[in-house]
A protein has these predicted regions:
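C-terminal membrane-associated helical module and adjoining short loops/tails
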Residues: 239-320
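"…together with the soluble PPM/PP2C metallo-phosphatase catalytic core" -> "…together
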Residues: 2-264
Length: 320
């Protein structure tokens, strides 16, 4: 990895580590709001999400500022915007009156009843920040071409934010997905996308030990932010056709998640299962393969401290 990309990864790792240490000294009220109990009955914290999101975004902004101020601004808007509304859903979505508003159907039902769910706020916030970020990325000069390019970039950014979040259902899974997705984007180019992918890599590697050790959880704040940053990296590098194909793939995965259990698919696929279980603690009460219900968006379970989806291993963020 050339010096610039190594520098972005190292800065993200250092910033994430420093924020992790600072998070241990948060006021009791904040610590309690971020506290959860996992399926083992052990305390975990959602502080991993904000610290990882901030560490990755800071390094990505610095890494791209010398390449393109517009890309650096897009990185900041997408990363911080997704982290902010994700944190809102992590905390507010844990309230008893919000626990039934899960999945897109749950958000729509809440709106029909005259309520705005925390998840709906998050979806709107991620979409809005993705649209602003997309408008800052390279686009055609004609009005119509610019509108198409912006819409495609925004779809890639918002879609990536949501898809990474879909995998935050087991310790380390979303971080591994983020690292695998960042891999191809580390190849050097002049757009600045490699610096963004490097920042995500450094932050994810730093967060991985505590996540695998079930001491902390990524939650919506972290998963949405890392996904949004990867979306910016991809949209910055790709042309219109590449953005369209990537957007279609992400939308397809989101649609599939409403019908298919990603956990069950991973459990039935030996190679994916091996990667998924690498580094994790020995299972205690995890369900057998194929038990989880269809449609398990992490955004809908990350903030529920006392309830769980049928077939998922237990209460707490990420359904863990």
């Amino acid at each position: 990895m050339p010096a610039a990309r190594f520098g972005s990864a190292a800065l993200a790792a250092a910033a994430t580590y420093a924020l992790q240490r600072a998070a241990t000294r948060l006021p009791a009220s904040i610590t309690q709001a971020l506290g959860r109990t996992n399926h083992r009955g052990e305390p975990v914290t959602l502080a991993e999400g904000p610290t990882t999101a901030l560490g990755a975004t800071l390094a990505a902004v610095i890494g791209t500022s010398g390449v393109s101020p517009r890309v650096a601004t897009a990185v900041g808007v997408a990363g911080l915007g997704a982290a902010a509304v994700g944190a809102y859903d992590d905390v507010v979505g844990a309230r008893p009156d919000q626990r039934t508003d899960k999945g897109f159907r749950g958000h729509l039902n809440a709106l029909r009843e005259g309520r705005v769910s925390a998840g709906a706020v998050k979806v709107a916030g991620v979409g809005a920040s993705a649209l602003v970020a997309g408008a800052l990325l390279p686009r055609a000069r004609s009005p119509l071409g610019a509108a198409v390019d912006t819409a495609l970039a925004a779809t890639v950014i918002a879609g990536a934010a949501n898809v990474v979040n879909l995998f935050d259902l087991r310790p380390g899974r979303a971080l591994k997905v983020g690292l695998l997705a960042a891999g191809p984007l580390l190849v050097s180019d002049r757009s600045g996308s490699a610096a963004v992918a490097s920042a995500v890599t450094g932050a994810a590697v730093t967060a991985l030990p505590d996540d695998l050790g079930e001491r902390s959880m990524l939650g919506d704040a972290g998963a949405n932010a890392l996904g949004a940053l990867l979306g910016v990296a991809a949209a910055t590098r790709l042309g219109r056709t590449g953005r369209a194909l990537t957007a279609a793939g992400l939308v397809g995965l989101m649609a599939a998640s409403e019908k298919v259990s990603f956990t069950a698919v991973i459990a039935r696929t030996p190679a994916l299962n091996a990667i998924d279980r690498w580094g994790r603690r020995a299972p205690s009460t995890e369900p057998a393969a194929g038990v989880p219900t269809a449609g398990e968006p992490a955004a809908e379970v990350t903030a529920a401290p006392t309830s769980q989806r049928v077939g998922e291993p237990g209460p707490g963020a990420g359904g863990r």
